[in-house]
């Protein structure tokens, strides 16, 4: 491993970027009710789904043109500039250079956790979880965190960042077990639950007390759990900030002794200046902790932003080890090589028709699929519609009760539902095995959100596909995404399938009817499945 050092005042900051095995040569490169900060902008977004907007008010426009059999007009597909026509998969664009001169170095594929100074009980625990060898981010960060260094860890989604900070935290905690030893902040409830479960699994040989502090649950049991001095607290910033503001001194005083703090998905937590920014809540949480000079701060993310890099420039106490910056595949290889990226041109007025027929193609029918939307309203609408079209579907977005969100995610993981319709609350960090296809029903406005979305498939070296639906208003967004990931999308094709012909022949009338039923269910306040939501009255 090579390193490049630069002088920050009187201190040395080391940056290391590790090239993944099999890579090509390096290129130049406020409140607890709203814990799902990934979705805060849903209802005010300018990127409303054209399809839903054009159908939402039947007073303004007809939901769909219902045709008699045999009366089939030709649907004019969206005219998209030739720029987004099919390109060779090997046609690479020049990715942005975010590495700031970081050194790329190869790693030893035979490295073991024991070689990283991980204690035998942790090595055995990881082995029981079928985690035999460390990934690049784990090789880079674990030894340095064990040395007491603050750390910025950047690595693409699915690369094992949680283990990279959980293992050294647990090893250092076992040497001096007291509460509260570590605090982990993460943007969404689902991520918090996943991290909580990993801490419990890895620490199973020990008597670790971990507590989960997220919205959607009663605050009183959470306050009681905090007052009992758990060893590790995993929280969303909004709910923990609520406890700091409203709970008694007994609830929060133990936070003043925290030794280690982790900001997971740090780019999202530290983003400022946008509606729904979590930064104020994050700052309130950190204000109660010991000062940076007296604690170890760890930032992990798939996209290392300037706000994240700013940690290395913070004033530091004389004698404290310098910040360690480890970036593995964060930019040049942000998209896994095993991921096939494609686009599908669809007419704005018939997107649901195309989606229905696309899900039923011979190659897609056996796949486990995640469909991403920009708004919760769109996700709710598509869930109703696809269920009426007899797809096995469930949903994950911020407007669902917490218990239902956990149940829905469990159904999808257990393959009881083949399709998960989600907003960006599901885009970051969630480990959902065996997702074969990601569909961007709405094009994300931020290219980094695209990276997080498509990262739900092609995980751990598996193959995967991502298909983005493109309308006439989306071309510039596609260009921005291609520039960010350094690769052009191919046009979607499947041998023997003419999607437009199938839409015309098979889905116009059926989908039109089911769209009206779905909109009626939503207007009457019914849940997916037709039951009326508790407390909702039928609209007169």
Swiss-Prot record:
A matching Pfam family: DEAD
Compartments (UniProt record): Nucleus, Nucleolus
Domain spans labelled Helicase C-terminal? 354-505
Q: Does the keyword Thylakoid apply?
A: no
Predominant location category: nucleus
Q: Which reaction does it catalyse?
A: ATP + H2O = ADP + phosphate + H(+)
Give start-end ranges for motif DEAD box: 264-267
Which keywords, in A-to-Z order, does the entry hold?
Answer: ATP-binding, Helicase, Hydrolase, Nucleotide-binding, Nucleus, Ribosome biogenesis, RNA-binding, rRNA processing
Superkingdom is Eukaryota
Where ATP binds, per the record, is at 155-162
Could you state one GO cellular component term attached to this entry? nucleolus
* UniProt enzyme class: hydrolase
Q: What is its EC number?
A: 3.6.4.13
Start and end residues of each Helicase ATP-binding domain: 142-322
List, alphabetically, the CDD domains matched. Answer: DEADc_DDX49 (cd17955), SF2_C_DEAD (cd18787)
Q: Where is the composition biased (Low complexity)?
A: 23-32, 43-55
Question: According to the UniProt record, where is the region Disordered?
Answer: 1-65
Please provide, alphabetically and separated by semicolons, the GO molecular function terms listed in this UniProt record. ATP binding; ATP hydrolysis activity; RNA binding; RNA helicase activity
Q: Which family does it belong to?
A: Belongs to the DEAD box helicase family. DDX49/DBP8 subfamily.
Question: What is its biological role?
Answer: ATP-binding RNA helicase involved in 40S ribosomal subunit biogenesis and is required for the normal formation of 18S rRNAs through pre-rRNA processing at A0, A1 and A2 sites. Required for vegetative growth.
According to the UniProt entry, the note on domains is: The Q motif is unique to and characteristic of the DEAD box family of RNA helicases and controls ATP binding and hydrolysis.
The name of this protein is: ATP-dependent RNA helicase dbp8
Q: Give the originating organism.
A: Sclerotinia sclerotiorum (strain ATCC 18683 / 1980 / Ss-1) (White mold)
């Amino acid at each position: 491993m090579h390193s490049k050092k630069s002088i920050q005042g009187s201190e040395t900051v080391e940056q290391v970027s590790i090239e993944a095995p099999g890579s090509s040569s390096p290129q130049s490169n406020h409140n607890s009710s709203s814990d799902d900060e990934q979705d805060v902008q849903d209802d005010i977004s300018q990127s409303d789904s054209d399809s839903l907007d054009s159908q939402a008010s039947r007073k303004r426009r007809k939901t769909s043109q219902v045709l008699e059999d045999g009366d089939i007009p030709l649907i004019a597909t969206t005219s998209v500039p030739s720029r987004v026509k099919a390109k060779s998969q090997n046609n690479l664009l020049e990715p942005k250079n975010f590495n700031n001169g970081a050194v790329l170095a190869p790693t030893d594929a035979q490295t073991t956790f024991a070689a990283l100074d991980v204690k035998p009980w942790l090595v055995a625990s990881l082995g029981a979880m079928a985690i035999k060898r460390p990934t690049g981010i784990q090789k880079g960060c674990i030894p340095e965190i064990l040395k007491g260094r603050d750390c910025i860890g950047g690595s693409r989604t699915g690369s094992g960042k949680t283990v990279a900070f959980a293992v050294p935290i647990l090893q250092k905690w076992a040497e001096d077990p007291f509460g509260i030893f570590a605090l982990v902040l993460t943007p969404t409830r689902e991520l918090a639950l996943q991290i909580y479960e990993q801490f419990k699994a890895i620490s199973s040989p020990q008597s670790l007390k971990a507590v989960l502090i997220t919205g959607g649950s009663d605050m009183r049991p959470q306050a009681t759990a905090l007052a009992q001095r758990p060893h590790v607290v995993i929280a969303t910033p909004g709910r923990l900030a609520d406890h700091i503001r409203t709970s008694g001194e007994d609830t929060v005083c133990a936070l003043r002794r925290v030794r280690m703090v982790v900001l997971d998905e740090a780019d999202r937590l530290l983003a400022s200046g946008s509606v729904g920014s979590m930064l104020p809540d994050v700052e309130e949480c950190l204000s109660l902790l010991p000062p940076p000079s007296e604690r170890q701060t760890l930032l992990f993310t798939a996209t290392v932003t300037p706000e994240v890099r700013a940690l290395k420039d913070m004033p530091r106490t004389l004698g404290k080890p310098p910040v360690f910056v480890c970036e593995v595949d964060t930019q040049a290889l942000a998209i896994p090589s095993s991921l096939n990226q494609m686009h599908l041109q669809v007419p704005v007025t018939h997107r649901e028709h195309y989606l229905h027929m696309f899900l039923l193609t011979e190659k897609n029918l056996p796949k486990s699929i995640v469909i991403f939307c920009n708004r919760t309203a769109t996700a709710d609408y598509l869930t109703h519609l696809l269920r009426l079209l007899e797809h096995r579907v469930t949903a994950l977005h911020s407007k669902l009760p917490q218990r239902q969100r956990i149940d829905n995610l469990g159904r999808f993981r257990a393959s009881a539902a083949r399709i998960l319709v989600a907003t960006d609350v599901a885009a970051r960090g969630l480990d959902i095995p065996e997702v074969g296809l990601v569909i961007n029903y709405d094009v994300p406005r931020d290219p980094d959100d695209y990276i997080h979305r498509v990262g739900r498939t092609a995980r751990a070296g598996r193959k995967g596909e991502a298909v983005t639906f493109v309308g006439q208003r989306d071309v510039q967004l596609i260009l921005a995404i291609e520039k960010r990931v350094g690769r052009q999308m191919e046009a979607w094709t499947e041998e023997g399938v003419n999607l437009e012909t199938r839409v015309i022949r098979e889905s116009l009338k059926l989908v039109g009817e089911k769209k009206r039923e779905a909109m009626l269910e939503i207007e009457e306040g019914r849940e997916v499945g037709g039951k009326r939501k508790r407390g909702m009255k039928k609209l007169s």
